[in-house]
């Protein structure tokens, strides 16, 4: 589940009309949401608030072996008046990302007077204290600058300066294609990411209704200090919202199953990965991924799904035993046409949503995650089961160890890998 600050940053991207799907880093976003989700560790509590339309605060307290926490502040010159900030009103599907419906490429927004800016800082406690800071600025309708700083304080007796790393990212998005240029002070790393969308250019042909989208992208990294070279390329084919039902009600059946196909290749390491994700119904999605290495002949298979559950709570009517007197009084005071109360429509009822995510790999490592709303609290609970490693050999070794311990009378191997609960409240 996204924390409150990530949710506000998502609202900032929507407010500046930035298409997050038009980026190479989002090429496999759907698969990552359905298969690479993380479960909470131990117990963690989040308290957040949107104090003003431009300023937000967040406090986190957790117990992961020891008590630790963080303090976060965020400021933006873009107002968040229309952004739900109360935990009881925030749409759960925005906080629990699942199947990601890719939107059609759009033309850059028209230039406005004020340039959107966002400042975000997080201080992690206790020592070693770590400070993370983020600066975002929309330079132009097609350009965005991002500066991320991470500084860690050394040991208490150390007199050396705190270690700090600066990551600079410049994004150029035209709708038809996007380029990202990166530089990190860690080993003087230079990077580039690019994505190209096949089809008409939305800047010149924005009225064309497209049913599918084919995108190709690549990334490359180089460090002159450590002589590090990295490279990858990928393809994505997905259906667009125009291919499905145009009804605004998300509970109605869809005419065409939205699906996403991806293919990624890392030539230097010989890794090849393919994935297929489908939204079988408005509340059910499946995903699978197969990875193969041509050098080591190792393979990986992962499958998972997410299931959304919706429940409605009807309005509670108080019965104090005097309804007969009110009905008799209405006969004399109220016309007969208004005696029958209007029925409560489904939109007036309170709707509660929750989601269950399950993933399993070829080594029978299982993760289960439940996320939902309890009263005005957002709760995320998860558990991990299976061998600690994700390689097929670890599963065989664990089976052999379990058999040896069983024959010698020792305790059986535990497949319990951890459980955690995260509770969030925002106002």
From Swiss-Prot:
It is found in: Mitochondrion outer membrane. It is a multi-pass membrane protein. Its main location: mitochondrion. The keyword RNA-binding does not apply. InterPro entries: Mdm10. Keywords: Membrane, Mitochondrion, Mitochondrion outer membrane, Transmembrane, Transmembrane beta strand. Residues 393-414 have a biased composition (Low complexity). The keyword Protein biosynthesis does not apply. One of its GO terms (biological process) is mitochondrial outer membrane translocase complex assembly. Residues 393-427 are annotated as: Disordered. GO terms for cellular component: ERMES complex; SAM complex. Belongs to the MDM10 family. Component of the ER-mitochondria encounter structure (ERMES) or MDM complex, composed of mmm1, mdm10, mdm12 and mdm34. Associates with the mitochondrial outer membrane sorting assembly machinery SAM(core) complex. PANTHER family: MITOCHONDRIAL DISTRIBUTION AND MORPHOLOGY PROTEIN 10. Lacks alpha-helical transmembrane segments, suggesting that it resides in the membrane via beta-sheet conformations similar to those predicted for other outer membrane proteins and porin. Component of the ERMES/MDM complex, which serves as a molecular tether to connect the endoplasmic reticulum and mitochondria. Components of this complex are involved in the control of mitochondrial shape and protein biogenesis and may function in phospholipid exchange. mdm10 is involved in the late assembly steps of the general translocase of the mitochondrial outer membrane (TOM complex). Functions in the tom40-specific route of the assembly of outer membrane beta-barrel proteins, including the association of tom40 with the receptor tom22 and small TOM proteins. This is Mitochondrial distribution and morphology protein 10.
């Amino acid at each position: 589940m996204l924390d409150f600050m990530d949710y506000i940053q998502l609202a900032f991207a929507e407010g500046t009309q930035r298409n997050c799907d038009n980026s190479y880093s989002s090429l496999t976003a759907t698969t990552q949401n359905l298969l690479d989700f993380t479960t909470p560790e131990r117990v963690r509590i989040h308290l957040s608030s949107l104090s003003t339309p431009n300023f937000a605060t967040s406090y986190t307290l957790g117990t992961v072996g020891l008590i630790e926490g963080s303090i976060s502040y965020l400021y933006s010159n873009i107002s968040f008046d229309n952004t739900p900030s109360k935990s009881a009103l925030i749409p759960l599907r925005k906080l629990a990302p699942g199947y990601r419906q890719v939107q059609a490429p759009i033309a850059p927004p028209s230039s406005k007077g004020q340039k959107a800016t966002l400042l975000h800082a997080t201080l992690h406690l206790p020592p070693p204290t770590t400070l993370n800071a983020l600066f975002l600025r929309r330079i132009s309708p097609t350009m965005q600058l991002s500066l991320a700083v991470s500084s860690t304080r050394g040991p208490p007796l150390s007199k050396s300066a705190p270690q700090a790393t600066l990551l600079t990212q410049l994004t150029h998005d035209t709708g038809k294609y996007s380029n990202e240029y990166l530089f990190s002070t860690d080993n003087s790393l230079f990077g580039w990411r690019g994505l190209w969308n096949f089809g008409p250019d939305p800047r010149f042909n924005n009225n064309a209704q497209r049913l599918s989208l084919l995108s190709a992208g690549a990334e490359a990294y180089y460090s002159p200090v450590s002589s590090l070279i990295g490279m990858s390329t990928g393809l994505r084919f997905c259906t667009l919202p125009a291919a499905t039902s145009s009804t605004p009600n998300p509970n109605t059946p869809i005419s065409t199953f939205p699906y996403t196909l991806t293919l990624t290749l890392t030539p230097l390491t010989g890794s090849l990965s393919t994935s297929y994700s489908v939204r079988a119904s408005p509340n059910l999605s499946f995903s699978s991924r197969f990875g193969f290495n041509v050098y080591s002949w190792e393979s990986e298979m992962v499958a998972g799904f997410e299931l959304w559950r919706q429940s409605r709570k009807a309005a509670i009517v108080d019965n104090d035993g005097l309804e007969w007197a009110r009905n008799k009084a209405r006969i004399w005071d109220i016309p007969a046409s208004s005696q029958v109360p209007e029925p409560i429509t489904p939109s007036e009822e309170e709707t509660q949503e929750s989601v269950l995510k399950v993933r399993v790999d070829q080594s029978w490592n299982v993760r289960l995650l439940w996320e939902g709303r309890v009263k005005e609290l957002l709760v995320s609970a998860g558990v991990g089961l299976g061998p600690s490693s994700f390689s097929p050999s670890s599963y065989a070794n664990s089976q052999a160890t379990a058999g040896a311990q069983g024959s010698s009378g020792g305790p059986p191997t535990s497949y319990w890998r951890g459980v955690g609960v995260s509770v969030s409240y925002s106002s």
